[in-house]
Amino acid sequence: MIGRLLAGAAMLGASGALAAPVTIHAGRLMAVPGQAVRGPSTIVVDNGRIVSVTAGYQPASGQLIDLRDKTVLPGLIDAHVHIDSDRAGNEGQLAEFTESVPLRAFEAQWNGMKTLRAGFTTVRNLGDGDSGASLAYRDAIARGWVQGPRIVSAGQSISTTGGHMDGRNGTNDEVDAHSATHHLCDGPADCRRAVRLQVSRGADVIKIATTGGVNSGTGLMTRMEEDEAQALIRTAHSYGKKVAVHSHGRDGTKLALRNGADSIEHGTDMDDETVRLFKQAGACYVPTLSTVNGYLERLAKDPNAYPPAVKKQIDWRIGITGKSLEKAYPAGVKICFGTDAGVSKHGRNADEFEWMVKHGMPAAQAIKAATVNNAELLGLASEIGTIEPGKSADIIAVAGDPLADVRALKTISFVMARGAVVTN
């Protein structure tokens, strides 16, 4: 995975990194989120990489970018997006059956650029439909054909028949006959096959679902047996792939953690035993709280945007959102940052910070989750997540102090990704 991702490290898609050295004068520098913020600093970038970081305003080498009135920090990382879609509910289900694969790839690029301009220079895409759009977009960025954030992609998500990833849920027999089922599995042997298929298609990470989902309308209970989860996770790990697990109910989360999951996505319901298993496994918790914004906004526009069964689950999700984070963070569970963008809006990824702070995380730790912690989760800690010599020049800037008011991260003044200026 890392070799493919680093192949495009010196370029930002079609525009490429700036050829000459670039000097950035930063008024305040959050070089390593979670550590002390530095005062006036100078960052030198060359060939897409950070060459040096020094105190004070040093003479410019090549082009000068003046950010002396800004807070400068590493490019943000969203560990849970669906880059090829910006719809959900009835509209999203219709799109699955009416939009072509090439159109979904164009949509991925459209959403990717909104995400990049919002300061998120890396994303982890946790599930396409059957389009493979995120894989194609990832590779096009790496080849320099188009612009976009660095993408770590799961390809298609895996679940059991009738589980969260079964697109046939609620459809008639004629639709069922033409629906993809190769990402569904039943029994350990079949689940090993499903992982191997996604790896063969180029997945960087494996995403599985141990419970139903809010949008799938089949309930939020556990939808996978112990031997199936074990087969999925062990097979993925044998290929060197981390495993992200969609789970809402506590039993599905415990099932995943017992079997070595690397991250839990959503984790909406959590008890003390769940927290203990998180810490024992060393897994990262990705709360995706800002999905609530997406649900509320769609329902405000159309009260019938979701089928009744889904609407019931949305009401439950809204009522309990943030409770697990309030339990997990003080207990020492490692928190990572993800939005589930596609359910919520691409380009508004920073809304998640406000939710995290609302539910008990200091702004500094929420920012660390979206940089240092996520870089570790993605296996890219040597490349991204901090502003240090040798790393990819993924750098953003905001007016004001995001430690005092994390909402400052909703308005990005400057974006550099892999040494190329996207927004200034």
Predicted feature locations:
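Active-site gating loops and adjacent loop-to-helix segments of metal-dependent hydrolytic enzymes
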Residues: I83-R104, T161-A180, N215-E225, G282-I318
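Divalent metal-dependent hydrolysis catalytic cores, especially in the metallo-beta-lactamase
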Residues: E107-S134, Q147-S157, A203-V214, K242, ...
